[in-house]
Amino acid sequence: TGTFYRRRNELIFYSDVDFHRPIIIRNKKDFKIEHRTKAVLDIIKYKDPLETKISAVLGKEHEKGVDIDAMLYENNVRINFNEHIKKEVKKLDQVVTEKDRMNRVDYRMLKTVTIDGDDARDFDDAISIEEDEQGYILYVHIADVSHYVKKNSAIDKEAYLRSTSIYLADRVVPMLPFELSNGICSLNPNVDRCTLTCKMHIDTEGKCTSYTIVPSLIHSDQRCTYAKVNALLENDPSVLAEYDNVKDLLLRLEKCARSLQEKSMERGCIDFNSKEAKIILNKNGKPVDVQLKSRGFAEQMIEECMILANVCVANYLHSHSLPCMYRVHEDPDPKKVYSLCSIADILHEEINFDPEHIQAKDIQLLLEQVKD
């Protein structure tokens, strides 16, 4: 990628990457190129001078989104979906059919919510919770994408190549077509959706005593946001009317999550409670501010639920000898541990662990000491 600038009476291309050699553009006359036009070149021959052709004109460099477009092209991000994928998508139903409902546990009678950020557009997990004499029954519902995306289909192969959705300041480049990610595979409110559900029995001490994992059917009652759930948990009257239908569920979920969190801390779980930076753009797509997004307990509730569901699934896969990649954390670098000890010493904080054999619990206690 690069930009054309007019120098005297000639348009000169300035590449974003310095190739240390002149560039010849074979098809410049085929495009309407003006001063400050951003474009993408394909290299035809690696020689001196470099032989290229224009493959895309992105627009003027100051126009909204052109800088992001250039970055995506520069990093070979797959943006568009080909015709084979579009044809497969057209064949997919955008509503749950009777055939889809077969062989699924029906959880549509459960009060169910999604909780995500204000700007979320696709919802891939939902929560239900009940209370009984032993404690809680927690349901984590995950969108059953595999029901719609079949192995070795064009959509599946494209998702494999993309690996993940890419979240940018002004857009999302999805792993799946929007008809799936924002449509039939998104757990939108007031519609039936196919899911995989991890149903977990949790005692009053926050211990998961049993679980089951089943194909399921849900019907989300409400799309909640972290900001408003946090407001509800803080007894803000401005959200009571909007969340009246799911208030009991959210308060029950809060109690359950706190017991899960306490159990995690007993095991030595480390809570770094880091803040995420969010770039604020103006109407022209230019960055004007960077704000820190703080995590309230609503975010922590969902985190606790998802971690527990992941642990249950990992245990299930392990107990059934199914191949799986487990996400684990390596032991910390001893040099960094000694650096940490040096900083703690400067702060006059007491170190009560052996740097050569540090445990997660040790880091947790140190963080607790210095959190103020």
Task: Report the location of each language-model feature.
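A short, compositionally biased
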Residues: 6-10, 194-196, 273-276
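Append "with occasional cross-activation on large, charged helical scaffolds in nucleic-acid assemblies
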Residues: 201, 213, 226-372
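A short, sequence-level motif marking secondary-structure junctions
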Residues: 27-31, 56-60, 214-220, 294-297, ...
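Covalent nucleotidyltransferase
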Residues: 130-132, 172-234, 242, 252
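Structured core elements
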Residues: 40-42, 53, 112-114, 126-128, ...
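Short acidic-glycine loop/turn motifs at beta-strand connectors
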Residues: 7-8, 47, 131-133, 202-207, ...
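Charge-lined substrate channels and their catalytic hotspots, especially those that engage the 3′ end
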Residues: 1-142, 146-191, 230-231
